[in-house]
């Protein structure tokens, strides 16, 4: 019969297995995970990731490498990050783009309705510096990327001597972006028009096709998806879904208004283990970017845990300010900062999917099938 003196020993023996299990789990969770998947390993070898890069990936950090490009005005990056969640959870979170994207570098964001309408852009407010610059905007000399028609709109529809210039400018900007998305949905790349902010007009569709025509191999060929991005709105791949959103991004340079077209393309039972490919096609940006395309490959593969996957990212963009002596000095700086921004964004994706709790300092409000989000306070 147990006595009062030996009862603690029995209790200790009962607790011992749980203590050991807890310790083992703690060590396992704190240790890097050595991902081993034939498809992803092949891609990473092809991109010449180092042993240090792989250790960083296994430790849960995003790894980003700058890629060589054939022209100076193009930047390209390959990235990988391991995410402790299923690809399905990622897609579910990502589809709620307003909550997913918002953060310190994204003070404003909204998703367009299935049939875009003015209310989708109601919260959009241009940065004060952009409003001031628009007062001096002329074809061939404008601080913002605008078509000749848009420059005329700001000149003709805004009373620049009025006390409510900001309200008028923002109203014109919202109308301009709404028209852009509607026309793009009807006519595709032809509706993207030309930028007339510099001496030489720049065809946005031409810049996008140059990005699309890159010879750098993709992690996995997706010809139907690429053809759709080029031929939109025709021949959408079976099973693909899409949406459009706008945002104001601010990562330390000029805050930039961007409009993006997102296509989520599922790959059923692909031998590679890639379950989805996500394309993010830039339609417009007020600064820096002439065109941009990001492709994300969600590779579950045969890793140690089906609840984990690896996200492979390939980003290409055409940018300003890389010509001449000044451009040769600036390009390495722009490239380094852009690479750091891509790395930071991939780690943001990881946090959003693994935790995904919206910060209390921001507020979102649904507007039918659209969403808008602005920084609170």
Indicate where each model-derived feature is located:
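N-terminal secretory signal peptides that target proteins for export/translocation
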Residues: 1-13
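Short, well-ordered alpha-helical segments enriched in acidic and aromatic residues
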Residues: 92-93
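Bacterial N-terminal signal peptides
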Residues: 18-30
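Short glycine/proline-centered loop/turn elements that form peptide/ligand docking sites
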Residues: 96
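Intrinsically disordered, low-complexity serine/threonine-rich segments
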Residues: 19, 368-370
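Terminal "cap-and-tail" regions of soluble proteins that handle hydrophobic small molecules
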Residues: 35-89, 99-365, 372-377
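Intrinsically disordered, low-complexity polyampholyte segments enriched for Lys and acidic residues
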Residues: 6-9, 369, 375
């Amino acid at each position: 019969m147990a006595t009062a003196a030996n009862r603690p020993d029995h209790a200790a023996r009962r607790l011992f297995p749980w203590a050991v299990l807890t310790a083992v789990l703690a060590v396992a969770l704190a240790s890097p995970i050595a991902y081993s998947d034939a498809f992803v390993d092949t891609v990473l070898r092809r991109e010449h990731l180092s042993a240090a890069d792989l250790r960083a990936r296994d430790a849960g950090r995003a790894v980003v490498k700058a890629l060589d490009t054939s022209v100076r005005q193009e930047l390209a990056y390959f990235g990988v990050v391991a995410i402790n969640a299923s690809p399905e959870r990622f897609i579910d979170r990502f589809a709620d783009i307003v909550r997913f994207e918002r953060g310190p570098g994204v003070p404003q964001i909204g998703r367009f309705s299935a049939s875009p309408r003015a209310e989708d852009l109601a919260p959009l407010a241009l940065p004060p510096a952009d409003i001031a610059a628009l007062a001096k905007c002329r074809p061939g000399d404008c601080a913002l990327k605008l078509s000749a028609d848009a420059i005329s709109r700001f000149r003709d529809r805004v009373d620049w001597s009025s006390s409510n210039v900001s309200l008028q400018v923002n109203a014109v900007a919202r109308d301009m972006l709404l028209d852009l998305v509607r026309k793009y949905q009807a006519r595709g790349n032809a509706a993207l028009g030309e930028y007339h902010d510099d001496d030489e007009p720049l065809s946005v569709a031409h810049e996008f096709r140059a990005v699309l025509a890159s010879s750098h191999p993709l992690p996995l060929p997706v010809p139907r998806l690429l053809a759709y991005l080029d031929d939109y709105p025709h021949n959408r791949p079976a099973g693909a879904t899409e949406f459009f959103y706008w945002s104001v991004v601010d990562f330390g340079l000029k805050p930039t208004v961007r409009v993006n077209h997102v296509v989520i393309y599922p790959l059923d039972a692909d031998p590679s283990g890639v379950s989805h490919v996500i394309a993010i096609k830039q339609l417009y940006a007020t600064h820096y970017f002439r065109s941009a395309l990001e492709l994300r490959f969600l590779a579950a593969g045969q890793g140690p845990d089906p609840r984990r996957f690896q996200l492979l990212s390939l980003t290409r963009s055409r940018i300003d300010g890389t010509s001449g002596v000044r451009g040769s000095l600036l390009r390495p700086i722009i490239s380094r900062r852009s690479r750091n921004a891509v790395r930071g964004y991939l780690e943001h994706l990881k946090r959003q999917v693994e935790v995904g709790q919206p910060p209390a300092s921001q507020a979102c409000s649904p507007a039918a099938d659209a969403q808008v989000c602005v920084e609170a306070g």
